[in-house]
A protein has these predicted regions:
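A short beta-loop-alpha structural element at the N-terminal edge
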Residues: 3-19
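Helix-loop element at the rim of GNAT/NAT acetyltransferase active sites that forms part
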Residues: 9, 21-34
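Conserved GNAT acetyl-CoA-binding A-motif
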Residues: 108, 115-128
């Protein structure tokens, strides 16, 4: 992990295609889902962050979509104001052979540092598959609201206020 190149990548570039392939393999294909052109086009205005190993293979990636703090953050901390600029963190993927080795935590740390360094936004929220809620709690996210179904799987809404 010490030799990992963490970087923001541009939509549509070859590195972006590598992250789409990883996200498809881990998040979409197991559910029988595929990316549509429209879904990928909708990512043009998002921030794409990824880690690459020395060979250039993508190790981990995620997407930050500019948004506003959603109304479902009912038990939010006082600093979480509705309609405040926020990022919707989505499509977090870590290569299967690297899962459980700290890559997800390193990716989240990189994403949080990116937000703090490059943006005035401090609120980040996500929809976590129930199977990984514990991971997000360990990285500082709090559950908000009741479980719900998304892409046929139970999810939990979660949020975190980043402090510099």
């Amino acid at each position: 992990m010490d030799e990992t190149l963490w970087q923001e990548i541009a939509w549509g570039r070859s590195e972006y295609a590598l992250t789409v392939a990883l996200r498809h393999t881990l998040l979409r294909a197991p559910l029988g889902l595929h990316f549509t052109k429209e879904a990928l086009d909708a990512e043009k205005d998002s921030i794409h962050l990824a880690g690459f190993d020395p060979s250039g293979a993508v190790s981990a990636c995620l997407v930050l979509r500019p948004s506003v703090t959603p109304s479902w953050i009912q038990a939010a901390p006082p600093e979480a104001v509705l309609d405040m600029p926020a990022y919707h963190l989505r499509q977090v993927a870590v290569r299967q052979d690297l899962q459980g080795l700290g890559w997800g935590r390193a990716l989240m740390d990189y994403a949080h540092a990116w937000v703090l360094d490059k943006s005035p936004v401090r609120q980040v929220y996500l929809h976590a598959r129930s199977s990984v809620v514990g991971f997000y709690e360990a990285t500082g996210y709090k559950i908000a609201g009741e479980p719900f179904l998304e892409v046929g799987l139970e999810h939990r809404a979660m949020h975190r206020f980043l402090e510099s």
